[in-house]
Amino acid sequence: MKPVLRTSLKDEIFRGNLLYVEGRFYLIADDVQEAPNCFMTHATPCLHFVKVSRKVNPQTDKFGFAVEDTGERLHPLIDNFPAVLTFSGTMADAKNQAGAYFADVIEVKLQGNHWTDEIKTGDILTLEGNPGEYEVVSWIRDSLTAKQKGGVLTIQARRKP
């Protein structure tokens, strides 16, 4: 059961805010209406935690040769950040054939802030409790207004083979 949050217009809750209620994180992924007759907005539960890392190339010496024992490694950008996850695969159907759902593409919604601003295409995304890795293929930063700096960062990532 979703908790009911009672707020006023003075609380300054915006799209992209994270709320922590009764042991669970919620992301305000919809626009919050500021008119007195339009108080309702939806808080989506963050059921997953994500980690985002970036591949760092090996170090080289002044001649351009790789220094020993500094192979390619992952540099963590975000660790255990609450997120909303959906699978955004495609349906493939034709006459007399069953549709196939390809679940190798995920869509992750995160709070837009100075940590998530660092995410780029090609970064590696992992889900807590899931051994697979996903590569960020696109991202969209939306819902910025004149009153706020946050917003929602929507990432599409493809499962790595």
Placement of each model-derived feature along the sequence:
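Short, conserved turn/kink motifs that form compact alpha/beta structural patches or helix kinks used as
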Residues: 1-154, 158-161
